[in-house]
Amino acid sequence: MGLPREFALIARHFRPLAGDGALDLSDDAALLTPPAGQQLVLAADALVEGVHFLPDDPPGMIARKLLRVNLSDLAAMGAAPLGYLMTTAFTRGTADAWIADFVAGLAEDQQRYGLAVLGGDTVATPGPACFSLTIIGTVPPGQALHRRGARIGDEIWVSGSIGDGALGLRVLQGKLAADAEGHLARRYRLPEPRLALGQALRGVARAAMD
């Protein structure tokens, strides 16, 4: 992807998603001032076509899944979302309408969860498509939840149903008879980041993980 096309794509699709500190996505980096009295929490996850999503998955769903798997990491730490950096590697020749749907999915969940894009990179690849996101959140000092806090004898509590996403993938691959637009498929495509629960568990749970 040449620089003129990259800049045009960013201006047309991603600039409307930009938040404070993103500098209109026109500079080399973003500027971020953490909220007073808060620690920053950072996590990163990537989605690769054929590994984490199927080639015919709706682009908006792929974008929302990308955001949500990262938000889930914040939830596990008891953090609140602040913003994110994202690298998109679209396959060469990806239709503009596909990218527009992808961005619309991001916009929908940005509004739902209260965060904005701060920067990133956009490239073209011969395939497979790959999308990487670094999420930034905040938590009061000393209140982050850790995996290492667990102790022998602790009770283990689970929110949601374990395995729904894996079953949903089998449905979409035709390996399990069920509605391809039903509950299991939706759980595979759209995980639910439990941000409110994670924040409520600060000072209550000794450990957490997503």
Model-derived segments and their meaning:
Residues 1-209:
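Helix-biased detector of long, well-ordered alpha-helical tracts
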